[in-house]
């Protein structure tokens, strides 16, 4: 009896290991080596050209990748035109330059006869994300490929799937852990806010109406409050965009974490990473060592790129990223 029980436990353990490695085994670097060997160069050139037109290309593409992966997995469902995920309020603020970056890169890839209709929009978005990180001074990293494009994109599927500006650490960890991402991964990915921007309407409560007894969030730097009030005065258009990193907003560096140490996190969900003792040591580590942040970011963005992917014969290779075939 004990022997059979041991065999069953071992079999179940082996099955779990097999399932957990399944996605990463199907995604791999060099996936298009035979079908479209120059895909990475083609995407790189297209993204660089778009980036030269507007810096917004970088934060917009990064945010687009994150939003895509957290809703139905990294399947480019965010790219599908309305009615779709893009109709949800959490996605309506996504900058058009992110979508345009993927469209331009897809056009460049498909203009090569050897590559036409062979590379998924999901993979192009993953590659474009790496390129904007590099273009802003961040680390380069190998991108696993082999994703297929999803056929489903609905407004309802976005509900409660994306982190909110007022989230506390428990809420952040809970949401990220559902996708196999650790607290360290979450903090590293939050570091991408170093080149991010946000709209006045998303943070004004912290500086004008934080609580019934306290107008200003006590965790926010008072000098930073003055700056924010100048950029987002009462009555301003809530869509006005401001940088999330007030020191080096166009450079992918560890300044975001140094800002948190000074109380200069734009969102509650940013500043909580430092004010909560459970995550403070990681923030301090990344603030003290850009190398530590860069390595953690590479690990986290790679894991993010594996979330909910479609591979093999699942999904499709979309001819037009904005609509299913």
Curated annotation (Swiss-Prot):
The keyword Metal-binding applies. Slightly expressed in roots. The record marks 63 as: Transition state stabilizer. Ca(2+) 2 binds at residues 194, 245, 248, 253. It comes from the Eukaryota. Substrate binds at residue 163. InterPro entries: Haem_peroxidase, Haem_peroxidase_sf, Peroxidase_pln, Peroxidases_AS, Peroxidases_heam-ligand_BS, Secretory_peroxidase. Heme b binds at residue 193. Its cofactor is heme b; Ca(2+). One of its GO terms (cellular component) is extracellular region. Its main location: secreted. Residues 1-25 form the signal peptide. It catalyses: 2 a phenolic donor + H2O2 = 2 a phenolic radical donor + 2 H2O. There are 73 peroxidase genes in A.thaliana. Removal of H(2)O(2), oxidation of toxic reductants, biosynthesis and degradation of lignin, suberization, auxin catabolism, response to environmental stresses such as wounding, pathogen attack and oxidative stress. These functions might be dependent on each isozyme/isoform in each plant tissue. This is Peroxidase 45. It comes from Arabidopsis thaliana.
